[in-house]
Design a protein with these regions (language model features):
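Single conserved hydrophobic/aromatic residue that forms the stacking wall/gate
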Residues: 2-13
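PLP-dependent class I/II
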Residues: 10, 16-20, 30-381
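Short phosphate-coordinating micro-motif centered on Lys-Gly-acidic
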Residues: 26-27
Length: 381
């Protein structure tokens, strides 16, 4: 995140202190009514219930506490943000990766993954491991920048309804909208088709400041109540003072323009990096948000080459679930991850949040890293 793009939010902090929030109360609502009202204005669907979490990770953790049991499968995108994979492992569950393209998880691959996991469950006496959750990033996916299209939402919903007619037995779908208002794509959700099976989480860390530690969470009433019950075992509720600060920011025109400007700048940096990479004959998907995924032939060699030039990127291996299905029906080994789609193969994550990361020199180095092999790396050195 480029903090220089958020300087205009400081005046909103200075004006804070109108004290609309509930003070010294253990019985107030878990989300301020005035905040919920303003959030619902641009939420991607009309949810039954809403609450607040202390960031997207906190919301994910409480949701997993409520719905994931040890031994369960949790279907994720591949590649997937490593912290999410770590959270799944910490709950004693198993991440199962499904490849994706520029519009998110591939419906055919999800279909095959559900078929495979269900057949394995039925093959075990008394039932084996169940799929309890499907984790998705609806826009500005980390690390690929992919965002759902309306067509992809319909296709994924159709696959799920084919496996779970009328929604009976359907895993909980959890959407992590981690980039929130700095994503250039419109907010969207599978809840537009499957409202009773989706928990949608929107973070405000990248848009309004990480120290707010705030994310809004929506879903069917019973799911939201189960998540609130998990939070009562710890912090109890999210500070209503912080909720009021977020409300003031969302209602403030200057803050709105600051966030909008940041969104446009990040989008411009994505487009600029795409053009610079094309000049280097490297055509990769550059989507939305702060990151892009560069497929590489040899990850260790690529990382060494970039480190020699002082360019920091994230190694791709931690983004890949150890269990994952191929992008096409020819990949029988679910653990190999050997799909035809680049997003499911070896790669590195590049962050374009800072202006200095977007220039000809970086693009040339990334193109070289994408093609490098151990042999060419040795020759280069």
């Amino acid at each position: 995140r480029d903090f220089c793009l958020s300087r205009g939010l400081g005046d909103v902090y200075k004006r804070q202190g109108t004290h609309k929030a509930f003070v010294n109360s253990y019985d107030g609502p878990t989300i301020l009514p005035m905040l919920e009202q303003i959030l619902r204005r641009n939420w991607p669907y009309e949810p039954e219930a809403m609450t607040m979490a202390s960031g997207a990770g906190d919301g994910l953790a409480h949701t997993m506490n409520a719905f994931v049991q040890p031994g369960d499968f949790v279907i994720t995108e591949a590649p997937e943000y490593p912290l999410i994979l770590d959270m799944i492992e910490a709950h004693g569950a198993m991440a199962f990766g499904v490849p994706m393209d520029g519009f998110g998880m591939l419906p055919d691959a999800l279909d095959r993954a559900l078929t495979m996991l269900e057949s394995q469950r039925l093959a075990v006496p008394h039932g084996g491991h169940q799929v309890s959750m499907i984790l998705l990033q609806p826009r500005a996916q980390n690390p690929t920048g992919a965002s759902f299209s309306p067509q992809r939402i319909d296709a994924l919903a159709d696959v799920l309804l084919a496996h779970y007619p009328n929604g009976v037995g359907m895993p909980l779908i959890v959407e992590d909208d981690h980039s929130g208002d700095v994503a250039n794509a419109y907010a969207t959700s599978l809840a537009q088709r499957l409202p009773q099976h989706v928990v949608h989480i929107r973070s405000f860390s990248k848009s309004h400041g990480p120290d707010l530690r705030l994310a809004a969470l929506s879903g069917p009433e019973d799911a939201v109540e189960a998540i609130i019950a998990q939070r009562r075992l710890g912090s109890g509720w999210v500070s209503r003072f912080l909720q009021e600060i977020l409300y003031e920011m969302l209602a403030d025109k200057e803050a709105f323009h600051t966030v909008t400007n940041a969104r446009h700048i990040y989008a411009t940096r994505q487009k600029t990096m795409h053009a610079l990479l094309l000049r280097q004959s490297l055509d990769v998907h550059t989507g939305d948000g702060l990151n892009l995924w560069i497929p590489v032939r040899d990850e260790p060699a690529a990382l060494r080459l970039l480190a020699e030039q002082g360019i920091r990127v994230a190694a791709g291996k931690p983004f890949l679930p150890s269990l994952r299905i191929s992008a096409d029906a020819t990949g029988a080994d679910a653990g190999a991850g050997a799909g035809v789609d680049a997003h499911a193969s070896r790669g590195i994550r590049v962050t374009i949040a800072q202006q200095g990361a977007v220039n000809e020199q970086v693009a040339a180095a990334l193109a070289q890293a994408a093609a490098v092999t151990p042999k060419t790396s040795t020759n280069h050195s």
